[in-house]
Amino acid sequence: ICYDSDGVGSYIDGFIRGAVPFNGGASCYPVTDPASGRLIKENYLNLKTQCYYRTGDRVQRGEMRISPDVANKMYDESQTVRQRFMFERKAIQRSKSDKDGKLRIVSKDDMKIKLGGDSPDLLDMFMMREVFELKPKTIFAYGNN
């Protein structure tokens, strides 16, 4: 389980054994360069940006999808999960690189404006699972084994 360690999500810390905190403003994780095999730091502003870009690339390559059973379930009283994903997707956009050339996405405030005051909670959750692709795996054993 990965949880948003900012705001309300910070209360999860310590309650779910093995849960991984996600701090979107943190530095991005190093990745293995396919050419050299070395760890490199990608050119993203922060972890949230790194995960959104990498998740988008993964979806475009067909490596991730939402099953039809889940996509067709109701998200709330007016939208299916698929409709909510499509609604939130319009708010997640690339932003101009900063002076250091770091890749960015638009601010959370700009996202909320595009979503009529809503936060892109569903897409944030989908994006946060990318942390398991980036972060070394930790195995938690229960009991005395």
Residue ranges of each PLM-predicted region?
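Outer-membrane beta-barrel transmembrane strand signature
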Residues: S97, K102, V106-I113
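Acidic, Mg2+-coordinating catalytic module of metal-dependent nucleases/exonucleases
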Residues: K108-K135
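Residues in and immediately flanking transmembrane alpha helices
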Residues: R17, L134-K137
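Mg2+-dependent endonuclease catalytic cores in nucleic-acid-processing enzymes, primarily RNase H-like
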Residues: I1-K102, A141-N145
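C-terminal regions of RecA-like/P-loop NTPase motor modules
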Residues: F126, P136-N145
